[in-house]
Amino acid sequence: MPEHILSGIKAIVAMKLRRKGLLQKEIAKIIKSDRSIVSHYLSGRYPKEKILNVAKIIEEMPPQYGAKFIHSLTDNKELAKNLIKELYGIKLFWDENSCIACGSCLGCAALTLDNFTVGIDEDTCHLCASCIFRCPTNSLKFIKEE
């Protein structure tokens, strides 16, 4: 069942990427699928409507919950990051005004703390939201990318 739900999310992301003008080859690379599967996604032949409905519910979730859910569906962190980024259009943000520099978020390899400043390595960050849930002051959050 998780594979089916993941297929629904991939289908929604494929359709979004197509609307942005990407080619099937480019979409296939982002969603880690072969081009024939992308063709099925874009034509509406796959997955079933029930699966797409579940994927749409995930898309409507607050990003931090959707991100955790998507990461639970696959062990491929790069795939999960690509899907989350395209599905929600987000990036991780640190609010320096509310941060107490407690270090709770530092279990994540993408974050560093130096002189009371949290650094975010966007290449290392998999948008898993673990740091968001660890932060006691809600200083880490997802925001829309511009």
Curated annotation (Swiss-Prot):
Binds 1 [4Fe-4S] cluster. Its cofactor is [4Fe-4S] cluster. InterPro entries: 4Fe4S_Fe-S-bd (IPR017896), 4Fe4S_Fe_S_CS (IPR017900). SUPFAM superfamilies: 4Fe-4S ferredoxins. One of its GO terms (molecular function) is 4 iron, 4 sulfur cluster binding. Keywords: 4Fe-4S, Iron, Iron-sulfur, Metal-binding, Repeat. Residues 90-115, 116-145 form the 4Fe-4S ferredoxin-type domain. [4Fe-4S] cluster binds at C125, C128, C131, C135. It holds the Pfam family Fer4. This is Ferredoxin-type protein FwdE. The lineage of its organism: Archaea, Methanobacteriati, Methanobacteriota, Methanomada group, Methanococci.
